[in-house]
Amino acid sequence: MHPTHSQLIPSERYVPHGRDILCNDLIIWRDSNISVRSVFNFEVFMRFALPALLILAAAMVSAQPHSSELSSAAGTTDPGPSSLPRARVAIVTDDYHGHKVDDPYRWLEDGKSAETQKFTDEQNTHTRQLLDAVTGRDKLRARLGRLLETGSVSVPYDAGPYYLYTRREGSQNQAVIYVREGLKGKERALVDVNALAADGTIALDWWSFGRNGKYLAYGTSPNGSEDSTLHVIETATGRLLPEKIEHARSAAVAWLPDSSGFYYSRYPRPGDVPAGQERYLRRVYFHAMSDPSNIDGLKDPLIFGDGLGIDDWANAGLSDDGCRLVITIYSGWTKNEVLIKDRNDPNGRFIKLTDGRNFLYSVQIAGDQIYITTNEDAPRYRVFKASCARPERKNWKEIIAPSADIIDQVTQVIGNRLFVPWLKNAGSALSIYSLEGKKIADVPMPTYGSLTGLGGYSGSKEAFFGFVSYATPITIYHLTLDGKATVWQSIQSDVDPGRYEVRQVWFNSKDGTRVPMFVVHKKGLKLDGTTPTLLTGYGGFNISQTPSFDENGMILLLEHGGIFADVQLRGGAEFGEDWHRAGMLDKKQNTFDDFIAAAEYLIANKFTDKDHLAIQGASNGGLLMGAVFTQRPDLFRAVLCQVPLLDMLRYQNFQIAKLWIPEYGSSEDPKQFEWLYAYSPYHHVKEGTVYPAILFMTADTDTRVDPMHARKMTALMQAAAANGADRPILLRLDTKAGHGAGKPRGKVLEDYVDSWSFVFWQLGVK
């Protein structure tokens, strides 16, 4: 069997490197999806992921020029007095379990109203006036454009006589699916969505192939919406079949071995369910390829999902021989259930492998054996083995015990080996075991960095993995089953990794917990306590923050003598499930405390100071930004707050946010209301306070985090903050764009240029 592979196309965290991203907020990084042989292609400008997506890097600091080794790129701008009108106040008072809470900008939740659109247009115009006036933008654009031309490539996957993979060349907006017959065969483009829209706003969301490679299913969506339409193409000829199935977001397609049909997940059509539920009620269906009257899938039988909750997330998978159907049901980011069924038994029923406990399980089937990776009573994960004939929990046998390191992502059966990816202090490692759990080899990693994919299945005679680090773009390695690695493809760039130093530092958080952080800068940089620095973090949804190439365009900052800092906060997966749970629900404040402590460490150890420290976060990381700049407005000069959650009392009422209640809680519950109200950024803006300069960035077709968060927070802060014109509160709402996944290179470049123009202006970088 082959697991589902998740990659954020811009970046399973808005997710760099597969963070899913609310990350991949909808996609679950530790997907136990069996032989789905599906690639959720959310390429990588990001890193996770998470999911990722995009994560633009930026931040700002002192308006006075920094005189160290910064070369001329952008100058400070005198914005002059602002004529931007204040937003209308219309207080709505809610009663939360006896607590009266005012909301002065409820009307800005309606993104379709003429008044809201006028507000947005005025804000965008004001933001453009300021950012377009930053000197040196053309130089920034030129360099950032060259950095984005680095491109990307995925690991190849073998399917019958074919190898399939994606690659994005430097100037392309979206990745292209390539196929070749044999590993050394001539490649040809199979699916190129760049031809579908000149501006690149039709995205390749995911793709999936069967064991014989006859057909490939893939999803596309417009304007970053991620509301995929499922298509099928014939691999040998490139002929597009008539199938066109709507509402197939992250469809987790599982092909029958003969490619006569596939299982998949989809969402209901609008009008078929009560309004507001169209983005929930994900269920599993089966589509037969032989029925020309059913190309839209509307006659496809429901296979699984009756009786599930509105926010349960169901996926199907198949063993490589197609004999066993596996259903995985996620309930939040801490729990799933796994069921298995013998498809050859006409009287077969689903058998539960799991027993309803609050753990995660990831399943692989090879032959008649099941391999289960789980954090059951093992926060850093372990591996069990069971027979398909007796799959119940009581019959499992542990073959890889918990260790000091974290089993990352999912273990994979490739050939007659078990490949185990690890995290060691937030850096990737890879080991090869026998199918009985005996270690055969550790695969040497090129440097400290991150695995970005693992290709192969139980019938393969070889494997592939991708690797990336902060200053080194992705390289794909071919791997023998005994652990010998050679380069298969590498992405070239003009960045010399030898010029930069990556160090990992540890510091104490508020409660004494030791927290790590990567710090990247030019070799030989003299630390005088005033170096412009960008600090970024995520800290949520069991997603790891690990090294990725040029995250957020940070190479630009390094080239100008600055520092990039990447902190591994509680709430993530860097140190297992305990680390995750220490930063969720009633313990979410730990995430914010960790980030604040990271900033204080950088200042105390002479990396930077308050006037030269900028911070950046997106999605769940945008919530992080809102929490820390409302709790410690004195600590930062500038903030990039991207696609953020900010009104935590009402977040669950918009888009897909009910899926996140297991991570955050809900104000509808009296106890959980107390947790959320204690830190909800929208409810902690204090009138007369001087805040950092802030650039809120959001998009009109974001189907994960509603733009209302950024609109309301902008209006509130512009009215309340005592900032001068040199510390503006800005809103930038992009059009024909979403949460980040699938954002075309052209739009990514515009995001980067605005972000870094803002940062360099605020940091005083010349």
Where are each of the predicted segments found?
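Short hydrophobic alpha-helical segments enriched in small aliphatic residues
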Residues: 3-6, 15-18, 36
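Positively charged n-region of N-terminal signal peptides that target proteins for export
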Residues: 43-50
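Beta-propeller folds
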Residues: 53-435, 439-462, 468-474, 478-482, ...
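Glycine-rich His-Gly loop
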Residues: 168, 375, 468, 536-540, ...
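Cap/lid segment of the alpha/beta-hydrolase catalytic domain
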Residues: 194-210, 218-225, 239-242, 481-484, ...
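Active-site-proximal cap/loop segments of hydrolase catalytic domains
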Residues: 553, 566-766
